[in-house]
Structure formats: structure tokens, C-alpha cells
Amino acid sequence: MMKSGRLLAGACLLATAQAAMAAPADRKATEAAFDAGISAQDQLDWMKEMASAPNHVGSPHDKANAESTLAKFRAWGWDAQIETYQVLYPTPITTIVEMIAPEKIVLGGQEPAVPGDDTSGKTAGALPPYVAFQGDGDVTADLVYVNYGLPDDYKALARRGIDVKGKIVIARYGVGWRGLKPKLAQEHGAIGCIIYSDPAQDGYGVGDAYPKGGARPDFGVQRGSVADMTTYPGDPLTPGIGATANAKRLKRADAPTILKIPVLPMSYGDAGRLLAKLGGPVAPDPFRGGLPITYHLGGDGGVKVHLAVKSDWTLKPAYNVIAKLKGSTLPDEWIVRGNHHDGWVFGASDPLSGNVAMLSEAKALGALWKQGWRPARTIVYASWDAEEPMLLGSTEWAEDHAAELKAKAVLYINTDGNGRGMLQVQGSHDYQHLVNLVAADVIDPETGVSVAARLRAAIRVGAYDKTGRPDEAALAAAEKGGDIPIGALGSGSDYSAMLQHLGIAALNIGFGGEDESDGVYHSIYDSFHHMTTFDDPGLKYGAALSKTVGRIVLRVAAADAPQQRFGDFADTVATYLKEVKKLADDRRTEDGKRELLLKDDAFRIASDPLKPVTAAAPEATTPHIELAALDNAVDKLKAAATAYDSAWADKGAALDAVRLRTLHGQLRDIDQLLLDDRGLPGRTWYKHLIYAPGRFTGYGAKTLPGVREAIEERRFDDANVYAGRTAKVLVDYAARLDAARGTIEGR
């Protein structure tokens, strides 16, 4: 949206801004004063209290944590309130899983206490291991092992003559998002699904099991949501609108994101007892995990399982704590910062490590406010509820306030679980340079160098030792001292509605890689003891997170200059287009090889006659995709971005307040130009044509998703259509940059 102001108004604006920043006087002093307000001890105290009891959605402690957070914000000088939504959140009434043949064994149940972790024995009020938004049911059937339960796994099973129709499948966690596993099982005709944590992923295959080490113990279970998040997140009954008390709701049977089959999670201690009994063909090498057994595929009737799940499907309250510091000169431009406060059980790492870091920022900002400092833009802090079930709290708030957010929000900054290690950032690439500038100013608490310097060193050493897989751009940047690229955003946390539905630029920030939180992820063992023993002793990286995010908030809220550098975004999109072209070329090459193998009957001839594997199914040949318009659009984007960045570098410092305000107005909502109201194929809620969660990756991002996924899934008409639509949004984006450059140059 274009904004303009009269000269007098601009002069008053500038005077007000100068007065507001008088205490402290400059950016470095402001950030130093902010840092002085960050206390790791505060974070430890808050976490210990917030993680002292189960805090899942609807629990008494979840409400108590929200009320305590509200009181803190108000004491620190924020204008704060709780906004409550009534969300569908199923909780378990019955969870039964048992082997009934070749012998009867009752499996599952609550995780046992471990020595040294006091809260692990506090199971009163804790929900048993389960997954949300599965389908209620009571089924008995043969068991089939489907590896990760992803499309290629079902192709491998089909080539071995194994059909899961009418069966219960068991899949291991990993590679793809958990919700895809039962969804694909359901689509292939299975009547039930078990998902287990294999020790190769996060158990003794990666380290000592808890409590000796931080890895997942024998009977640790990963809870989670299995709702079809890649269709839309949020309350399944209120897509596109806030789940207020009086909202119009779908019937549960009509909600497309709720599964129809029963699903339960399982520990590897229990899963091993099932898998050890399976007969049928020996599993191919990619199917083999870390259990001390020979993995078989089953399906021969040797193992039968009884699976029963029944849930309480009533609405539960979700308490979002929303706090504001009103901007002095641009109060209708918002910086939104969020982290959720609900967990699956105690949730010390996920989410409270990020939540207490956010509270530290809020306390430090409140102290600055009381000293007379004022941000130019309004700062909004949100402690979300109900993220774990399917991003309910943030999505319902974003949908409920959609018009206001699209009119006011400049940037959304998200955090979630946090731990020891390297800075990890994903998000809108026009903010990549800002992230790198901030990373150079924050000190790593264990090495004494900047977090940017440590990350560069880790990338270089990882490439040398072949222990990491940095992409070429990251390695080149690390070696030359340039900006480290940030990643793309898929889904899995509270940025999704902001970025992918509303088109608000977003960043997701955390530290990690040297913690051991994966081993207790979504289990009863994600506790204060585990967090402070194995993930971030002393919460030193919690303090580093506060200082990192706080600097970004302060710099964007100051509005003394636009913080975007658009050449980074343009270069990134150009890279994505190269990847899409290579994908199409590689697919055509692969298709040609497959056709020759089929023509020559090579699959049958090469197959072991005693262990026959059928030929790969024939598939349509990948045609040439019409990408000329997208090529031209990327060229226009690169030219416009380069020209804008150059104009700002040459003349930005000389802008008067009126033109600066006009420029802010032109850039505030520029990311919304990357939306297409028609959405992505088959999932219209997702409207962003540059970043989306993958249909078969979930948390993982797909870039240029309308084109890329259409090629991957052989929807070639869609690929051509979305190449054109993506080209249009990039041309519109480039035109806005040209207009912004005109403002800088006085045209």
C-alpha cells in the first residue's frame, strides 16, 4: 500500500522520532541497554515453574502459564491481554495396542519414570502417548512394516507383491512429517497405523539413552499431531476464519484434515517386540533400522495386532497472550514476535526454551520503555497456545485478525525449541542480510566469538571433514566471509499462517545442533532436568537467542531505514528456478532410462528368481515445461532488486522523513505480492508461490511449490499453469521495487 504525507506532518514525525530515541540515544547504546536486561537466571526460574506440571492444551497448568505470562507483560509495562479461542483438540479416552498373534502381548501405556528426573514420575494430569486428529476406531488385522511410510516405500512394497489394504501398518518416524505416514497408509487402504521411534534416528543409535545420556530411552514415545497440515493448519473445523465461540464450524466428518483411521505412536522398546515377530520377505536395505533384529516386511498373517483409539472431541480453550508496545511515529506498522507456550507434557525444550527467551526480550524491552525509549513501530509479542496440535493458537489469531495484519504487519519473528549449537535461521530472504549483520554482533556464549564467525567455521570444517553437507553458496560465503544464506520456511511452527496464508515476511530463529533434545522430543522426558543437563545447561544459548532476536526487533522497529536487501531474495529465487529446471531435466533423463529398461524386460531378467521383484510401474514421460515467462520474470526481479539496492546505498541516507515514510509504506506489504488468492493445487489455504510446506515433506519447505511439486507429482498441466502464475507475482514484486526506487531517487 502506498503511503504519503504532507511536509509539515513529516517534519513533526522526524522531531517526534528524535525525541523518542533520546534515552538511550543511539542504536549501539540501545542494544547494550537491552543486553543488560537479559538474564539466563530469569529464564531458568521461569522454565522451572512453567515445566513443573503437564501443560497441554486445556490443562490447568496451561491456563496458569498463560495467566502468569500476562501478569509479567503487564508488570513490565506492556499493554497485554489474553485472547481466547475455542479450538477442536481431541484428547484420548481409550488407547489400546496389543499383539494378539502369534502370542498376546499388551503394549503401550504411559512412559516409566527415570532416575534423577523428578517430573518423569508426575504422570497425574499427563495425557498418555497418543497422536491428535487420528480417527477413532477399533481394528484387528495383520501387520505390515512400511519403513518411513512415504510414497517410495509403498512403491518398493508393491514391487515385492505386498499390499497394505485391510492391514495395520507400522512405520518409523523420520524423513517425512509424521502426519503423512497415516495419511498415505489410509490412502493405500490400511485400516490402522502405528508410528514408532527407531533407535537409529534418536535412540541408542545416536548416543547414550536418557538418563545416562540425552537420547531417547527404550520406552520414550513421540507424541504429535497427524492432522493433514499440508492441506491447512489451524482448527480443522474453521478453515480460513478464527475459531471464536460463535464461529461457523464444519462437521467433524467433513473436515478434510482429520484422518479416518486409528493411529498410535509407540516406543522402540515396544515396536521391537512386534517387528521381531514379523515374517514375510526380508526388508530391503533402506528399510532397516537400528533394532537388533532382522527386519521383515510382514503381511503374511504371522503377526496380528489389535488397535483401538477413542477420543474426547470437545472444544478446548486456547489462551493466546498478546502484548503491545505502541509505536511513537508509525503505530500502525507492527513487528510481531511469537513463541508458543503449550507442550505435549512438560515441554521444557519444546516450547519453553524459546518461550522464556522471548519473555527475557519482553522484560528488557519493558525496561527500556520505562526509561523513556520508544520504538517508531508498534511491537507485538505473542505467547501462543495450542501450537502442538496443529498451530491452532497462532493460526486462529491470524485468521481472526487477517485484515488488520495485512494492513499493519511488517515482519513476523518466530522461535520454538532452542539449545546449544549454531545459529539456525529460515525465512524471507529479503531479511537475510539483516540476520547476518545481527549474527556478527552477538557473541557465542561458549566460544567467545560471534555466532556468525562460529557458524562460518562450522560450515568450513564440516565440508573438510565431510561431516556436514553445506550447499555451495553457504560454503562459498563461509570461505569468503560473506553472508551465510538462510533457509526456506516450510511449516511446523507458528510462522505458517503469517507467511504462507497472509504474505507477511517471516523469520524462524534458534540455536541447536549440539543439544540432545531430539531424544526426548514430544515425550514425558522433555523436562527441566533434561533441558538443563543435555540441551542448554544454564540456558546460555537461551540468552544468546534473546539477544539475537531482540536486535532484529529493535532494528526493524526503529524504522530509521528499511532493513531488507532485495538482491538476496532475487538471487535466491533465481537459484530455485535453476533447481526446478534441473528437476525437469533429471526427470526426463530418468524417464528415458526407465522406458528402455521396461522395453528390454531388464527388471524381470535382473530379479532374483527366488526373491522376485516386479518391474517399476510405467509412468508418463516428463514433457518440456513452459518456463520462458518465469525466466523473464526472474530477470526483471534481479534487475529491479539490484537497482533498488544500489539506489538505497547511494541515496538512502539523504531521504527526508516524508519520503522515508512513503518508502516504508511501499515496502511494508511487498511480500503480500507473492500470494495468489487461488492458492496452491489441492490446498488453497496456502497462497504463497515462493515458499510452502511440501505435500510429502510437511515440515520441509518446497520452493516455487506450484511448479516444483507439479513436476515431482507428474501434474504437468499444473506445472505450466503455476509457472505463469509465479511469473506474474514476481513481475508485480519487481514493479513495486521499481516504484520504491523512484521514491529514493525523488521521481
Language model region names:
Residues M2-M21:
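Gram-negative bacterial Sec-dependent N-terminal signal peptides
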Residues P24-A29, A36, K48-D163, P199, ...:
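Noncatalytic luminal/extracellular "stalk/propeptide" segments of secretory-pathway proteins
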Residues T30-G37, A51-P60, Y130, Q134, ...:
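Second-shell loop/turn segments in exported
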Residues K104, G135, R216-V282, L330, ...:
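Metal-dependent peptidase/peptidase-like ectodomains
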Residues G121-A156, Y232-S349, K363, A367-Q371:
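Soluble metallo-hydrolase cores and metallopeptidase-like ectodomains found primarily
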Residues N147-G213, S328, D332, W344, ...:
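A conserved hydrophobic secondary-structure block that centers on an alpha-helix together
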Residues V321, R337-L391, E396, V549-I552:
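Alpha-helical metal-binding/catalytic segments enriched in His/Glu/Asp
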Residues D656-R747:
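C-terminal amphipathic alpha-helical interaction region
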